[in-house]
Amino acid sequence: MDFVQPDSIKNIHKLSIAPMMDCTDKHFRMIMRKISSEALLYTEMIVAQSLVYTNKKENFLDFNNEEHPISIQFGGDDPLILKDAARMAQDWGYDEINFNVGCPSPRVCSGNFGASLMKDPEKVAKCIEALKNNCKLPVTIKHRIGVDDDDSFSNLNNFVRHIANAGADRFTVHARKAILKGLNPKQNRTIPPLNYDIVKKLKKSNPELLI
């Protein structure tokens, strides 16, 4: 497969404000936009099912025009729901969709999304395809370098190839594995130490991908 990057993301954003639960709401994002006119802003993670079934979609989707460029981050595991969420994101005017398979929260993982989804590359690929096939926005993914004992480079590389073949436009890699048993989300942000070498190896093995 030839990987052709959309014009809208050929110029990689060198600065972004990461999606953070209970933090990156539209008020926080406006403050960040005052600091930088170039940074790519992210929403908090939005559970796709909650968005699709609510009658108050504006509570999830509203943002200020000054926030562009802005990426909406979805969590979920159902391609049928994600395709509807993708259409809504495009209709609402977002610049990009980001799919979260990096969150280690027990609440998130109990819903079979977030970091736990990395154990099922084929399902993640189907989710990416659903997003890509139902909008014209760039679709990117945030993931870890592994989950629990499933942290070999070969498994990571296989995961990325699956997702690349599904059409993902960019990979944002949190350079530590997620430990879903025994650590809380706060600990998962600092334990184990970051492993930038494996991310460098991943990029070297996939030079055609935006990583």
List where the protein language model places each region.
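Flavin-dependent oxidoreductase catalytic cores
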Residues: M1-I211
